[in-house]
C-alpha cells in the first residue's frame, strides 16, 4: 500500500520569536568539511569491479600496511567508496563530536551494517579539521513504498567524527558586530532595530537594509555579554510559509494555512481542478471530502470548490487517490512553478 505521511504545522500569523531564531551573527557560522573514505564489512552489497577507484583505494590502503595487492586481483564486494561530509560549527573545540553524512560513490547496493574506516575531513583550505570513523546504520532512511527508490546508500552518523583542529576566531576583539537575517524582510529588520534600541536605551542597532542590522556595543559590556542579550530579545515576527517534502521518506510538512490559488493541473493520469466559482454538486463517482473538495477515483480527478484551498487539503486528497510520494512532489513543484502556492517549496 502506498502511503504519504503529512505533518501540519499549526501556527498563528504573527508571534514572538527570539532574535537568534531569525538572524545570524555575521562571521559566526558553520564551515563545510569533506573527505573520501571506505566503508567495509558490507554483506556483498558493496561496490563491484566496475568501480575502479574503489579497487585502487583498497589496494592503496593495504599497501600502507605493507600488503601489496594488485587492484585487478580484488574481487570483493564487501567494500564501498564513500564521500563523507560534515559541518564544523563556529567555536568548535578539539575533541568535540560532529555528525557526519556518508554517501556512496560507486555502485554499492547498501551501506547498512558497514564500518567507515578512518577518514580525514578537510576544509576548503585543504587542512584537516576532523577525523571520522564508525559504524553505519541507514535505518532512518528506508523510503516508503512509492518513494524515490532505496536510499540505503546514504546515512547520517551521529557523533561520527572528532574535531582535531579549531578555526581561529577573534570574536571578543571584533568591534564590527552585525546581524544578518535568515530571510530578508524590511519589517523584521525594523523590528529588531526598534526593540534593541528600546531595551538598551541608546542607539545600538541600525537597520541597513532588509537583511542587515549593524550593532554598536555599549562600552560597559563585552562582546559576548552584549550578543547574548541581543539574541535573546523577543520580536514580533510573521514567518514565510513553507512546504517541506522529504523525498526519501515521502513525508510532507506544511502549515495548515498555506493556500493554493485557483489552477488546473494535469500530472500523468491525475487531474487537479481548483475553482471556487464552480458549484457543481458531487456525481456518483466522487467522494465528498467535507472540506469543499471532491475525489473521483474512477478518473483520478480531484476538484476543490472551496474559497480557501490549502496544501494540506490537496495532499490529503492526493493520498486518497493513492498518489505516490513521487507524484506528490511533482505536483507540488508544478503548483509552485505555476505560481499557485503562496509558500517556499523545499525538497530535502
From Swiss-Prot:
Specify the signal sequence span: 1-16
Q: Does the keyword Signal apply?
A: yes
List the molecular function annotations (GO) for this entry.
structural molecule activity
Q: Which GO terms describe its biological process?
A: bacterial-type flagellum-dependent cell motility
Is-annotated flag, keyword S-adenosyl-L-methionine? no
Q: What is this protein for, i.e. what is its function?
A: Assembles around the rod to form the L-ring and probably protects the motor/basal body from shearing forces during rotation.
Protein name (Swiss-Prot/TrEMBL): Flagellar P-ring protein
